[in-house]
Amino acid sequence: EAPKINTEERTIWDERTMLAALQTIENPALHLAVHLSMILSLREGEILGLQPGDLDFDAADGRGTITVNKAMQRADKVALSKIDPSQIYHIFPDQREGSSSALVLKKPKTKKSSRTLYLTRPLKEELLAWLEKLRQDELAMDGRYRNCGQLFRLPNGMPVAPEALSKWYRTWR
């Protein structure tokens, strides 16, 4: 007989609890990521796979939509060489020389994972403010900004890695 796994049932937060939690997050990138996760039930890789072109603020009679059709993950370079290239959109340049892994933008695991979701007004406003912040970051870097094309970027324009987002989340929690 297989060993039994103890699983803890997660508590579903009501709107008040969710809003209270969001108010405690000071990191703007983490705030947006948690907001996307709470409202749209997006996973970490889906959040980091988002690009500005996935946002349509005029769709749904101005309510706005977000299309989820990519995921970001860190992959071992040896394993990466064995993956079907049609599943990979982009391999980001190494940030550390000699790294054995790479950040990869890839297709989601299943066709059902690709979907278009409606935005709430507060989420739409936060996304618009975030895009403005990215524009300001680029201007502040005075030609040194390296726009990776992702919605979640570091102030220098490079992508936020899943392990960075996880670390921010653990620090907040």
Predicted regions, residues:
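Intrinsically disordered, low-complexity segments enriched in polar/charged residues with Gly/Pro
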Residues: 1, 41, 103-105, 138-139
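Basic, Lys/Arg- and aromatic-enriched nucleic-acid-binding interface segment
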Residues: 1-52, 60-63, 112-113, 125, ...
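Conserved tyrosine-mediated DNA breakage-rejoining catalytic core shared by Y-recombinases
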Residues: 2, 17, 50-132, 147
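Short, solvent-exposed polar/charged micro-motifs at secondary-structure junctions
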Residues: 3-9, 128, 159-165
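Short amphipathic alpha-helical segments at helix-loop
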Residues: 6, 107, 111, 152-154
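Short, basic (Lys/Arg/His-rich) helix/loop patches that form interaction surfaces
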Residues: 20-30, 40, 117, 133-173
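Alpha-helix boundary/interfacial micro-motifs
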Residues: 33, 57-58, 63, 130, ...
